[in-house]
Amino acid sequence: KRMLSNRESARRSRMRKQK
């Protein structure tokens, strides 16, 4: 089970775009 917060999801999205 992963409890990712909305803010954490957005942060990962930005890192993915940078990569």
Curated annotation (Swiss-Prot):
Annotated stretches, region: Basic motif: 1-19
Subcellular location, record wording: Nucleus
One cellular component term from this protein's GO annotations in UniProt: nucleus
UniProt keyword annotation of Iron present: no
UniProt entry keywords in alphabetical sequence: DNA-binding, Nucleus, Transcription, Transcription regulation
Keyword presence, Transcription regulation: yes
InterPro entries: bZIP (IPR004827), bZIP_sf (IPR046347)
Residue ranges constituting the bZIP domain according to the UniProt record: 1-19
PROSITE patterns: BZIP_BASIC (PS00036)
First-listed, main subcellular location of the protein, grouped into a coarse class: nucleus
GO MF annotation terms: DNA binding; DNA-binding transcription factor activity
Record-stated family: Belongs to the bZIP family.
Name the UniProt record assigns to this protein: Probable bZIP transcription factor
